[in-house]
Amino acid sequence: YMPMLLSYICKVDFMKHPWYQNAGKALAYTWQPESKNIGFGDGNEKLESPGRVQIGFADFLARETGDPYAGWLAAQSSKALHDDILMRLYRIVRDKTTYNTTLPENAPKFTWHQDIGEVMMHSDLGNTKKNLALGFRSSIFGSGSHTVSNQNAFQLIYKGADVYRSTGYYLNFEDAHNLMSYRHSRAHNTILVNGIGQPFTTKGYGNINCAM
């Protein structure tokens, strides 16, 4: 609700900001229907398919921006949308708002989020049962808060299931497993130099110079 509230208060349409205009496509390419995700950071390993929060957000974006990627993702996950309680009141108010639920025919197999340093690739975005998906991260943002020391790391899934994924589990920010494994580079599909991983700091940044 925040962008709508701020739009009302400030008399500026926050939904026209590039972040909201591109969030639907980013969400669809990161988390295909009925599939694990190829994203990064705390908790990326937990769900087997997009959750109600993600689908509720996709529905919101589709209604407010007309994004076909967000509309397609929301339509493919109707049960999760039904279970979403956070945006339920919004959907009641916006009940008559319709949106496109068809994945664009010209949907690329590859998308590069240059501002955050992530690349997402799909062999068949529209068909999870045939899709091979790869996510790669080398970001100008280092390790801090909900990010981990996984520069130059990748996630690989096939038919919605993990092939190569980061390991471990998140309990709390300061437990031994979180600090020495889950957040450490050794838990991710990246490179250690003489057994040494990347630093736990926002200065431990990376970069993707080109992608094709």
Region spans (language model):
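Aromatic-lined, polymer-binding surfaces characteristic
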Residues: Y1-G39, G43-N44
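Extended ligand-binding clefts on enzyme/binding-domain cores
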Residues: K36, F40-R91
